[in-house]
């Protein structure tokens, strides 16, 4: 199981074309979702997300109104103050959590999330293989890119390719 983040980034980028083809394969084979879910559950059991936190350093976190309310309560600040202090407007995403170029999410301290119990839904569901809105197939759009960020995504996609005999070109 590959967990070194430098290798994950390099290998994830190297196999991105294969992962794009895999996404099309999965869309055309609905029964594949159960197999992929089973593999993802197995990989998630073997990798401790909280020891990695790479998603917190490299991903954009879109916030819902519910997330703002939850953060407001946790931080004991009114929603307008949370928005002013901890978010940025994004033309494509609405409100997003502020990020620091060096460490990522403003709530990340080393690999610890300072708001873990009250983190946004998108963070709770990450890497969106098992949890998240809609079907796994509907969430597959971002998986080729996430394979270079998340050891769980990378290892899940590689294990699935092995299991089904997917022909690699990358």
What are these model-derived regions, one by one?
Residues 1-170:
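Short loop/turn segments that flank or connect secondary-structure elements
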């Amino acid at each position: 199981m590959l967990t070194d983040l430098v290798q994950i980034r390099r290998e994830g980028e190297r196999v991105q074309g294969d992962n794009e083809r895999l996404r099309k394969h999965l869309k055309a084979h609905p029964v594949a979702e159960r197999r992929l879910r089973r593999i993802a559950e197995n990989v998630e059991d073997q990798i401790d997300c909280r020891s990695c936190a790479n998603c917190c350093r490299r991903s954009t976190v879109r916030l819902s109104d519910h997330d703002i309310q939850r953060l407001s309560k946790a931080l004991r600040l009114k929603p307008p103050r949370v928005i002013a202090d901890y978010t940025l407007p994004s033309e494509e995403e609405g409100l997003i959590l502020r990020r620091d170029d060096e460490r990522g999410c403003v709530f990340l301290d080393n690999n610890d999330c300072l708001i873990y119990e009250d983190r946004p839904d998108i963070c709770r569901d990450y890497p969106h293989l098992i949890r998240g809105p809609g079907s796994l197939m509907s969430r597959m759009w971002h998986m080729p890119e996430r394979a270079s960020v998340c050891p769980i995504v990378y290892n899940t996609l590689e294990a699935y390719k092995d299991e089904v005999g997917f022909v690699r070109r990358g």
